[in-house]
């Protein structure tokens, strides 16, 4: 049964004799089936009756399931059937000696039916062979007869093919079913050809995928095709049959139109042309496009075939010609084959891999003759019948390059005005391919038209596209107000229009930097006035100090802006130091005026202001300059330099306060600290550089830990919001995120411990890192606090500023102390929760502390 059966050498008499034997076998089987059908019907009725009676428990215990007679003691005893497990009487069952059990009459008939119908044999053989016995013999004889008589010339294209008679697929599973379906011979032959072509196409796809061993996607594609070969072949054969039926209907309609009178033919054709031009769906053009193999499968035919095709394509309108050129320019990945005959009239496109050619004009009917010669007549039969020659057309889908990032971004945020004004052409050829969303940029032709891949890779790539879309949605702000704030922060911070457009510029001239800084400040003020007037529900900006607005803006600084600002900050450091020094002098004078006399009038203020009039500007210009420069000093290097200069300015301010207010109580200081002496073997400049680099690392580590703490808090909030219905995949993703965040926190802690060890080594070397207590004065003339001032060196005045403080926390807190460096500095969170160093000093120096917090 599994061997190849060759009946081509039989004579006509032998063939007729074999057919008579097979026919007699079929007649006997038909009679046997009629006889067994009555038995099957009786068994089915009995089974339905038992299923109803078995629902009543009392009936099952007291009566026989077959004859419904009641059980009596010693007269009609109850016996249990060994197969159906029902209780039956003595007359409805028999004892099987070899099995040693009672079997009811219904179960005996079921055994007899299985024995006579040979169901056990056919079920076993069908699992091993798809066609066997008389069906296999009749199939071969029938094919031979059909091919010799020429009845299937229209299906096979007038040529013979070599069928694989060993385990070939068919819709018939046994001899009887094949005999019953032998009447529809034309459709069966068509299905056999379609199945064979589908299997050959799948085999070719597998071999092509296996040839590319360096690609993991191709290997996965080959394994998927091998595992689902039968299902894919059946689906492809069904698609081919649908195309054949559709084409036959089109041919019937065409013949009906040809038979119409000449007077009514132009009107009907015009109506049909208008209907096809307006109401034809995009997928229709793809379904009716004629595809041919090229290079590996076909060789080009003679010139007369091309002339025939060009003659058929010549009567087209100039508008169609222009549309064809537009489609050709929109699809550069397909090479034009119009120059085959030198007349540029055949509208052909060739795929980039050289496996396919297609006609771009799908409105007309395909030519009567093929433009290429097939490698086998099986492909010729398929192409003539169904105009389908590619297994990839049904197996594959869009590749990963078809994922449109512009569509995802358009869903997340509205496009700009410049993009709305630009027209976005969409070629009709790209729309008709049914590839989903098209790329809006004409410079990305690969996203418009890509080769179809298999269903295995398409499903994985579609999942990847969905994952990318979800990733973009997570990155986008979910709240409109948050999005507005984010955009406002970008306008406030990003002062480099070239960098925003994708270009970088280095400004080394200090004068140009000052002019650009003034222009940026004016632009920033104009951009800031609009949102403040539009937000009616929010409090006025005058209710908050300027430093709070600066802190809000600094939270939205992007990484690109920070990198650009770090480059520009060095060139404008001198001007920033002067503005900061003037601003701090003014703040210090205001503090001294409030402390000395709370009831002084404006005349005393006018006396103290001329003392520092040399280095001060107007308060409005200083405020704007401070806000602009503070936004530029977001990098670690700039913060380190600014903190050093600010501490110097605070020193000078405190000295001015001490001179204007009166004598101060200075605690005794050691002699070598007053003289600024360092231990032997140490260099002041090298220690200064090392401490500067350590402070930069501290700033970077503090920012990293602060961001990681925010991520951990968000993850904790998300974990609390998870309900019991959360899927396992979401829980696994959350666990992975928590583990990654914990690993980053651990890495940051290791960096912090390394920095602490280096600081301790510098302390042992003789560098004083711990800050001193600030100079303060008593509110009343009776109480004075001890203040330690050190003017020997810059290293002895170093203090580490607090980590970044959010605007709302700074506004709500009434106490903002200054804290020295310790091991828990980087992990203490907000500065409002830290222990105070001196309660009495906090209220006097709260404004300078707010300024230092904003600078970070």
From Swiss-Prot:
Domain RabBD: 4-124
GO cellular component: actin cytoskeleton; apical plasma membrane; cortical actin cytoskeleton; dense core granule; exocyst; melanosome; perinuclear region of cytoplasm; photoreceptor outer segment
Myosin-binding as annotated region, ranges: 143-560
Annotated region described as Disordered, given as residue ranges: 251-287, 302-323, 350-376, 392-578, 592-625, 778-805, 826-845
Subunit structure: Binds MYO5A, MYO7A and F-actin. Binds RAB27A that has been activated by GTP-binding via its N-terminus. Interacts with PRKAR2A. Interacts with components of the exocyst complex, including EXOC3 and EXOC4.
Domain of life assignment: Eukaryota
InterPro entries for this protein: FYVE_2 (IPR041282), Intracell_Transport_Effector (IPR051745), Myrip/Melanophilin (IPR006788), Rab_BD (IPR010911), Znf_FYVE_PHD (IPR011011), Znf_RING/FYVE/PHD (IPR013083)
Biased composition (Acidic residues): 395-405
Phosphoserine modified-residue sites: 299, 351
Any one of the GO BP annotations: intracellular protein transport
Name under which the protein is recorded: Rab effector MyRIP
UniProt zinc finger (FYVE-type) residues: 63-105
Gene3D superfamilies: Zinc/RING finger domain, C3HC4 (zinc finger) (3.30.40.10)
Chain spans, region PKA-binding: 193-209
Compositional bias annotation for Low complexity: 427-437, 450-460
The encoding gene: Myrip
Pfam families listed in its UniProt record: FYVE_2, Rab_eff_C
Negative regulation of PKA-binding, as annotated region: 232-248
Amino acid composition bias (Polar residues), ranges on this chain: 302-311, 551-574, 613-625, 784-793, 826-843
Gene Ontology molecular function: any one: protein kinase A binding
Keywords from the named record: Actin-binding, Cytoplasm, Cytoplasmic vesicle, Metal-binding, Phosphoprotein, Repeat, Zinc, Zinc-finger
